[in-house]
Each structure stands twice: as C-alpha cells, then as structure tokens.
Curated annotation (Swiss-Prot):
Biased composition (Low complexity): 58-107, 190-201
Protein name: Putative mediator of RNA polymerase II transcription subunit 30
Family from the record: Belongs to the Mediator complex subunit 30 family. Highly divergent.
Subcellular location, record wording: Nucleus
Gene, per the UniProt record: med30
Originating organism: Dictyostelium discoideum
Coiled-coil region(s): none
Transmembrane parts of this sequence: none
Length: 255
C-alpha cells in the first residue's frame, strides 16, 4: 500500500508539472500574439506597399522634368495671347472676350499643376524610414519569445520522460503480483483460516492498478494535446521568420 500511495503522489506531481508547463506555453503564445498585433501591418502586405511606394517615386521623378516645359508653354501662350489681344482691340471690340478668357485660364492651370506636384511628393518621404526601425525592434522581441517557448518545450519533454518511466514501472507490477499470488496460495494451503483477508488485499491491489492505468491514459492524452500545441507554435514561428526575412530584404533594398 505504501508503494501505491507513493506512485499516486508521483502521478499527481507530474500532472501539476504538466499543467504549469501548459500555462507557461499559453502565456508565451499570448505574448507572441500581442507582439504581432503591435506591428504596424502584415509583413507580406508591407512588402507590397514598399514596392508601390518605390513605383510612385519613380513615376514622380519621371513627371518632374515634364512639368517644367508645361509652365514655359503656358508662358508662351500667354505672350501670344497678349499680342493677339492688342491687335484685336484695335480692329474690333467683339473679339476681346475669347482672348481675355484664354489669358486668364493659363496661369490658373500652371498653379494647379504646381499644387498637384507638391501634394504628391509630401506623403512619400516619411513612410519609408518608420517601417525599417519598427521591424528591427519586433525581430528582437520575437527572439525573446522564441527562447521562452523553447524553455517551456524542454519542461514538457521532462514530464513526458517521467510519464514513460512510470509506465514501465506499472507494466512490471503484474509480474510481481503473480509471484505474490503464488506465495499467497501456498500460505492458504497451509492456513485455511486466513484466506478471506488475502483475497480482499488482492482485490484492493487490482483496483489501485486500474486507477493508476487510468491516470496514465489521462496523462498520455494531456501529453498528446501539448504536442499538438507545440507543433502549431513551431509552424507559426516558421511563418513569422519567413515574413521577417522578407522584410529585412526589402529594408536593405530600400536603404
């Protein structure tokens, strides 16, 4: 009976250790999720945003030399229009209205073109450096979370090893029980008066053995669930590492 109680205490202590390790794993997973939420946006999407920003800068650089002759053309048009207005006012008064309208519209168009060019160039410059700085800090934080997860996984491995040792001990028990039964039968043949208490002790030992086997099955299920959680965590960390590598490549390209 003392051995059975000791084994039950060991199983209870292993169950407590397993629950603590699962709790640590869940806390680490929550920390990773919170860290991912603090990132500005999805790394895959930021890769697309950075390429679009580069395309906008290139298109603006191509449009900038074209905007200069447009202003010169507008100035030449205004000069020609002014010359035409002086000639037409001397001849007739009816033709002055279209020339004045064309002369007034040309500087407005030049102002609109300069305003559009200035508004396009403003949002492109501050977006690029903020992304690169944030992802460096995120990478360091995720490394720390990885180390915490590895420590919790090692603790789970220790509990699984202890469970396997208990299983081997319990599998060896039936052989010992058979030997004990043989000795008890011999004693029963010698002393028929003591047969009732020996049978009761055998039944108690069998019940204890069934309870221990049930506890082992429960611990196996807990270990299987932990293994599934660890596999999901490893897959998520691999995807996260791939996204960080892609962002590091884009950051070095933009720099």
């Amino acid at each position: 009976m003392d051995k059975i109680e000791i084994e039950e205490e060991l199983i209870c202590s292993l169950a407590v250790k397993g629950e603590k390790s699962i709790h640590k794993l869940l806390l680490n997973i929550l920390a990773i999720v919170k860290q991912l939420k603090t990132i500005q946006s999805d790394p895959v999407l930021t890769y697309q945003v950075s390429t679009k920003a580069q395309q906008q800068l290139q298109s603006q650089q191509l449009q900038q030399p074209q905007s200069i002759p447009s202003s010169t053309n507008n100035s030449t048009n205004t000069n020609t229009n002014n010359s035409t207005t002086t000639t037409t006012t001397s001849s007739t008064s009816s033709t002055t209205t279209p020339t004045t309208t064309t002369s007034t519209t040309s500087p407005l168009n030049s102002k609109d073109s300069t305003a559009t060019t200035t508004t396009k160039e403003q949002p492109s410059s501050p977006t690029l450096p903020t992304l690169n700085l944030n992802f460096v800090n995120d990478n360091d934080k995720i490394k720390e979370l990885n180390q915490n997860c590895i420590q919790s996984i090692l603790a789970l491995q220790k509990t699984i090893k202890e469970i396997s040792l208990l299983e081997t001990k319990i599998s060896q028990k039936p052989k010992d029980n058979i030997d004990n039964d043989d000795t008890i039968m011999k004693d029963d043949n010698n002393n028929s008066s003591t047969s009732a208490p020996t049978t009761t002790t055998i039944n108690i030992e069998k019940q204890d053995q069934t309870s221990l086997s049930n506890e082992l099955e429960r611990l196996k299920m807990d270990a299987y669930q932990k293994n599934c959680v660890i596999k999901k965590l490893i897959d998520n960390m691999r995807l996260l590492q791939l996204s960080i590598n892609s962002m590091n490549r884009t950051s070095t390209g933009t720099d």
